Amino acid sequence: MRIYPLSEGSFSIDETKVFKPFNSSSPDYPNRPKGSILVEVQPFVIITDNDIILLDTGLGYLNKMGVLQIHENLMALGIDPSKVTKVFLSHLHKDHAGGISYLHPVHQEQFISFPYAKYYVQRREFDEVMKNSHNPTLLAQIGVLENFSGVVWLTQDKGVIDNLIHYEITGGHSEFHQVAWMKENEEIIFFGADVAPQLQQMKSRFVAKYDMDGKKSMEWRQQWWVTGAKEQWTFAFYHDIGQPTFRIDTTI
């Protein structure tokens, strides 16, 4: 398997939950808004023997040419977005699910971003967000899934997709947040999404205030760090600036 981050940039985010572009190499780096955190937003693409898999879809921003950012990032790697076969959604917060679909700048219609792919989505996560979110843009972006023939609704707490993607609901960050292990040819890539978003959090007993249950997330990270070392996982960190993937050295 090959894995590539599809970075959409660094962002400062505070209690308003608005993602503001932030240059982490600028002299103002230590002086971001009070109470904010600095994150990278980076979906991943994994190329296996038979599939091109997306892990989450980013913010859903369009570039100046009206091209979806995640499409541009894929094409920069030589990957035709229409060739993506699977899209796995960890949860449906804006920074992970915004690229599910996009508003066409000319037709002003919502288009599914990867029409030839299967979208794997937790049904309970979808229902919860559609019922409780007050963000009309997000609701439009994810709402198209209801009538899209390519959706595979996941209804179990854990399972296996095509003997390749092993998933499990963890909670922690959101009630139906799920993680995934891609397993092929004795190789394991682990995607912990927002329960395991950054390398540094794996190494400490960090409890995040932005989690629904920060203690539960911390306990998951400790468990995965130990198991990942034993089984030589490659970790994919969605929000890590500078360290998108990491494989634990068994000597540490």
Language model region names:
Residues 88-96, 173, 177, 239:
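Histidine-centered divalent metal-coordination motifs
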Residues 66-120:
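Active-site metal-binding motif and surrounding structural segment of the metallo-beta-lactamase
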Residues 59, 75, 113-169, 216-233, ...:
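Metallo-beta-lactamase
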Residues 2-8, 43-47, 53, 156-185:
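Core dinuclear metal-dependent hydrolase active-site scaffold
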Residues 53-55, 88, 119, 189-191:
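Residue-level marker for buried hydrophobic side chains located in beta-strands
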Residues 29-34, 107-108, 167-168:
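Short, P/G- and charge-enriched loop/turn segments at secondary-structure junctions
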Residues 1-50, 223, 250:
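Zn-dependent metallo-beta-lactamase
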